[in-house]
Amino acid sequence: VKPTYGTVSRYGTVPVACSGETVSVMAKDAKTCRKVLDDIAGHDDKDGTSLPESEIAKKADAKEIKRIAIINDMMADVSDDVKANIDSAVAKLGVEAVNIDSSVIAASRPAWNILMSAELCNNVSRYDGVKYGHRAEKFSGIDELYTNSRTEAFGELLKTAIIFGSETLSTENYMKVYDKALRTRRVIVEEFAKIFAEFDAVMIPACSKAFYTEENVKADKYISYKENFYTAPASITGLPAVVAGGVQLIGKAFSENVLLELASKI
């Protein structure tokens, strides 16, 4: 379960994209997820974005989920197994499921990748081998220490994201790329608000395939980066989401308990 942004303190974690990342819970069943989430939720004086338990309880949405939207634009490239998982989940939940179109929600990935890379670029700047992070053994000066330490410690995917983030924040790209991504985020949030005016939750795939083999990952090392197409909507909006039975449920803010109740039935 990925809780609503602000439910759990991020203090003590390695920051990547501070405006959207959350501390989530992975467990074998919904009951355990709920128990752990109850234990870790609440305000932390060292994290200004974390909310007090009283405020979380006050904002909690406990409305029963009876009507779910399935977004067609998020189903286009998924395998037959994933489509079968969606159908199976709907049948088990016994809710009304309606297929809708929303190219806005499908635009979450490019917008989130821009924002995430830009924030990541700033957040990892501290890992220079002096005070934080890996320290290279061989260097002839401070500049070479920075270069060697980061070259040795960072993987290819991280380096790619840093370069992309740096370009995104450059003077020539800031307004036409980064600022546009911020405005796109606002539009996506508004789109979810419109959907939730008619539906109680959104159901989309968690991945394009039901499972991946080691060979799949070796053949395409960027596969996990591509799969965030399905998790980006919840990340960029800060909405809660639950993955169970190969499907993903996204709910209204602070509706984690209701989502977990559904997850226990899938």
Residue map of PLM features:
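Flexible, glycine/charged-enriched surface loops at secondary-structure junctions
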Residues: 46-53, 95-103
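Conserved beta-strand termini and adjacent loop/short-helix elements that scaffold enzyme active sites
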Residues: 71, 98-103, 206, 244
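Glycine-rich, small-residue loops and helix-cap segments
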Residues: 40, 92, 119, 126, ...
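Short helix-loop-beta junction
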Residues: 83-96
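A short helix-breaking turn/cap at a secondary-structure junction
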Residues: 2-84, 144, 148
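Charged, often glycine-rich, active-site loop that binds/positions anionic groups
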Residues: 110-123
